[in-house]
Amino acid sequence: MRPRSLFPFAAIGMAFLMAAPVAAHCDGLDGPVVTAARTALDSGDPNLVLIWVQPRDEAEVRQAFAQAIAVRKLNAQARDLADRYFFETLVRLHRAGEGETYTGLK
C-alpha cells in the first residue's frame, strides 16, 4: 500500500478525534481531585488536597474538610453525604481557580 493512499484515512481519523467533546476530567467522581479528596478524608489529612486549589481558597477547603470529618462519624448515610459535600466544595473551588465554571460532579 502506498503511503499517499493512507492520508485520507489519517485525515478522517484526526477529524473525529478533534471533534470529540472534551470533558473536564477533574469534575469526575473518578478524577484526580475527588481521588485525592477520598484519600484525604480516609487519612484525616486535608493537606493532601490543597494542591488542587488556590491559596486564597485553602481556608474554605479546610473548613469543609473539618465539617465533613465531623459528620462522617455519625453513620453510613451521613458519611456519604459529608463526602459528597466535600467533593463538591473541593471541585467547585478547583474549577474556579482555573477560571472555569462548575457544573456539578460527573
Where are these regions (language model features)?
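Short secondary-structure capping micro-motifs at structural edges
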Residues: 36-37, 74-75, 104-105
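Extended amphipathic alpha-helical interaction segments
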Residues: 83-106
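Sec/Tat signal peptide C-region and signal peptidase I cleavage site
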Residues: 18-24
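Bacterial N-terminal signal peptides
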Residues: 9-17
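N-terminal, post-signal-peptide region of Sec/Tat-exported proteins
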Residues: 45-79
